[in-house]
Amino acid sequence: MSSQRQLPAASGTVEIVLLDGGGFRTTEDWRLHEGGHSRPFFLYDWCFFIQHKASGRKILWDLGISKDRSLYTPSVLANQWVGANPVGPRIPLTEQLKAIGHDPAEIDTVIFSHAHWDHCRPLRSEFPNASALFGPGTIPYCRPGHIQNLEPTMASQWDSRFFSDDENVRTESCSELDGHWAPWGPFDAAMDYFGDCSFWIIQAPGHMPGNLAACVRHPSGEHILLGSDCCHSRAIFDGRSQIAVSGPDSTKLCLHLDLDAALETIEKLREAVNSYGMHLALAHDPEFIREVY
C-alpha cells in the first residue's frame, strides 16, 4: 500500500508547456549558494503556458526576461542588469506560443509568481488582452514604483507601469489575487483558481511580499509544482547546498527578504514532493526537465 498522502478529489486538468524565458550569463553562483563559486555559468529563467482544459482559457505563469531594455526600470538596469548579464530567450515568447498553435492575443491572464524584474515586466505590447495578477501584499509593497512627477527615477526597482497610484502613469491592467484561500496538501493558503482542482495558486512566503508558487494537475493525473523563486536550485532543495547569506568578502546578503519564512516554504515544497508525490519545477534550475519531460 502506498504511504503517500492523498489530495482532495479533482475533476479538472490543464495543459502545461515549458517556455524559454532566457536567463543569465553570470559568475555569481555565490549569490545563490553559501560558499558558491565565481566561475561563468548559465542560470535559466523558465516560464510556463497553461491552458485550462474545460474552459479553454490560456494564461502564462511568469514572463522571464526580454531583450527590450525599455521594459525595465532605471534602477534595475543600473544595479542588477550588469552583474546578472541577462539574455532574452532564443525565440521570443510570442513566437514560442505561435509555434505551439496559440495566438498571444488569446492570453487573458499573466500570473506573476512575484514582482522581481526577471519574472515580471509590462506585458501590453506582447499580450494586448492580458491582465496581470500578483500575490496578496505585492501592490502595497511595490507602490508607487520608479516614476515620480511623471519622470523615471532611480528611486525604486519596482515598475510604476504596474504599481503607480496615478492612472496617467499606470499602463498595465493588474490586481492582486482575490478569492478563497484554504489549506491544501502541505500548504497553509492555496486558491483553487479554476474551481476544479486543476490549478492551485499557493501563497509562499519568504522571497518577497506576495510571493507565490502554484501546482497544476496534468491530464496524466500527475501534479507539477511550480516553485518559481521559493527555492533557487535543486541543490538547495535537496540539502546539498545552503542558501547564501554572505558574499565572497563576508558581506551579508540573501536573495530572500525573510529567510526564516523562505526556509519554512522550502520545507513545505519538500513535503509536497516527498509525501504527496508532486514533481517540482523551479524557475532557475534545469534538473526537473529530466524528471518531468
Q: Each PLM stretch: what is its role?
A:
Residues 1-87, 183, 268, 275:
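Zn-dependent metallo-beta-lactamase
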Residues 4, 85-102, 106, 135-202, ...:
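Metallo-beta-lactamase
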Residues 18-23, 35-37, 47-53, 57-59, ...:
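Core dinuclear metal-dependent hydrolase active-site scaffold
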Residues 21-22, 63-65, 115, 138, ...:
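Active-site metal-binding loops of divalent metal-dependent hydrolases
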Residues 57, 127-131, 277-278:
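A short helix->loop->beta-strand "cap" motif at the edges of active sites that frequently abuts
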Residues 70-134:
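Active-site metal-binding motif and surrounding structural segment of the metallo-beta-lactamase
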Residues 81-95, 220-293:
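Cap/insert and terminal regions of metallo-dependent hydrolase folds
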Residues 115-121, 208-212, 232-236, 285-290:
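Active-site environment of divalent metal-dependent phosphoester hydrolases
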